[in-house]
Each structure stands twice: as C-alpha cells, then as structure tokens.
C-alpha cells in the first residue's frame, strides 16, 4: 500500500534589505548549509550573481536563468540537482548559493536550507517556498541556525518591490500579496486561504494602501485587453440547426480560414514576442551548429 505522509512545514517570513544580502549570507552559511536567492528579472540575477562572486568562491555560486542556450542551461540545472537535489550530500551543499530567476521555481526538484526572494504574487511566492526544506533526508544535515525554514523578502530601502518586479508582475497583485502575508505560513494548510485573499474581488482590506486604486485600474485594463484579444479568435458555437450535418471539425476548419495563424498567435499569446535562434560555432575554420 502507498503511504501518505501528512507533512506540514512552518515557514517564518522576514524582510531583508538588499544592501545587507552579502553580510546576511556570510553569517547564515558560516556553519554550512545552502541558500537559494530567487529574483524576478534576469538582469537582477546577473547583477546579484556578479556581486556575490566578489565575496564568495566562484564555485559556490550558481547562476541560472532563461537566457542561457540549452546546453549551458542543462549543465547548470544538472549542477543544481547535484548540489541541492534529493541525493546531495552535506559536503556538496556546504556554502552553495543558487541565484536564479523564475526558471528555477517550478520544475526543478531542489532543497534550500534558507530562501531569499523578491516579492511576487502569492501563488508564485508559495511555489518558491516549496523549494525550501523540501527533502526530509536533509534535515539531519542542516546547520542548527538553519534547522527551521525561513523566507527572507528582499527590500530596497523603503520599497517593497523593485521597478523590475512591477514590470514582470502586476503591481496590484504585489500590493495585495504584501498586505496578506503573515509573519509565518503553514504549508500546505495556509496556501488556499492566502491565494484566495489575493485573487478575490473584495477590496475592503486593501483600499488604504497608497496607490492601490490606480494599480487596480491598470490591472483591470490590462486584463480587459487580454480578454479582448483572445475573444476575437474564439470558435463560434455550433448552430443547433446544422449540428447534425456539420461536425466540430467542420466548424473549426471554417473558422480557421478566417484567421491568419501568425496574427492569431500574436493576438492571444500572453507575453512578449520571442525569436528562436540557432547558435553557430567555429571549429577548425568551419561553421557548424552548436
């Protein structure tokens, strides 16, 4: 029979000034352990990794984001799993620091002893917290000062979130997330409650936040634009009178002839445009694919 483990994790949440990041990591990792620094933009990842390399051995810093070509990214992901994955040893984890973007928060199974992160919408933030104290196999390896999970929210002076964060995530959702975050979270018990509070339509608890009304209007306008772009390419509902004569495929093909595929993709895709690049390299005077 399969065994179900009702595991609950209490995560304490604190703030950390960005200027104190290096000092904080030195203090927290002085007895060993590993840390994950998860940031909202690639630029922030690059700048932070560069800064940390000036104070920590290069082999202790792993930079990971979406701008690496596939072979390099795969190599870094493998290194992350070796150093912080389920089979990682205390020696492999000792002093290791991951500096990563959203590329690391979803599909990679790693376990950090402490998490430092920029603020992001509640569902993403909770997903990041799920990469902390993830494997019970590592509990006996954790230094005493890192024996209990902590999530440090990076702040830049009085600002709770950076301009880059507001460019990636709606400021409206960041405001609501910041307002509902408690000082500690029980995972998974508190997940539904926190997410529902952030995405609920009710505004009563948020109206006194400076700039909240304008942020909400911008969010609603953007959501309206996205719905409008998508609705223009919805398939028509089948007509009752013709339903027996025309299959769903017939109706799909009829609708498809009205829409240019590239125009449709550009209109409904939720995100910026992207280009697919083929990377070449020079070997012995010859050009070949990487």
Residue ranges and their predicted role:
Residues 90-105:
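Conserved two-lobed SF2 helicase motor
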Residues 14-17, 93-96, 126, 130:
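A short linear-motif detector with a strong N-terminal bias
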């Amino acid at each position: 029979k399969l065994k179900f483990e009702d595991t609950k994790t209490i995560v304490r949440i604190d703030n950390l000034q960005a200027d104190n990041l290096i000092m904080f990591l030195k203090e927290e990792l002085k007895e060993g352990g590993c840390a994950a620094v998860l940031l909202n933009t690639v630029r922030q990842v690059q700048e932070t990794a560069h800064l940390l390399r000036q104070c920590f051995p290069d082999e202790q810093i792993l930079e990971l984001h979406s701008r690496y070509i596939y072979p390099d990214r795969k190599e870094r992901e493998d290194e992350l799993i070796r150093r912080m994955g389920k089979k990682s040893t205390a020696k492999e984890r000792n002093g290791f620091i991951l500096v990563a973007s959203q590329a690391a928060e979803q599909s990679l199974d790693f376990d950090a002893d402490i998490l430092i992160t920029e603020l992001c919408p509640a569902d993403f933030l909770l997903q990041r917290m799920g990469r902390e104290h993830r494997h019970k196999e590592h509990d006996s390896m954790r230094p005493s000062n890192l024996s209990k999970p902590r999530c440090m929210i990076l702040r830049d002076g009085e600002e709770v979130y950076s301009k880059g964060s507001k460019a990636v995530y709606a400021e409206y959702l960041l405001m609501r997330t910041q307002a509902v975050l408690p000082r500690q979270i029980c995972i998974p018990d508190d997940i539904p409650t926190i997410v529902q509070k952030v995405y609920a339509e009710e505004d009563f608890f948020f109206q006194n936040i400076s700039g909240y009304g304008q942020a909400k209007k911008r969010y609603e306008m953007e959501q309206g634009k996205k719905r409008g772009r998508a609705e223009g390419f919805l398939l028509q509902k089948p007509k009752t009178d013709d339903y027996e004569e025309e299959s769903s495929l017939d109706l799909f093909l009829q609708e498809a002839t009205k829409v240019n595929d590239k125009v449709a993709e550009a209109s409904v895709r939720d995100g910026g445009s992207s280009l697919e690049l083929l990377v070449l390299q020079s070997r012995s005077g010859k050009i070949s694919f990487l």
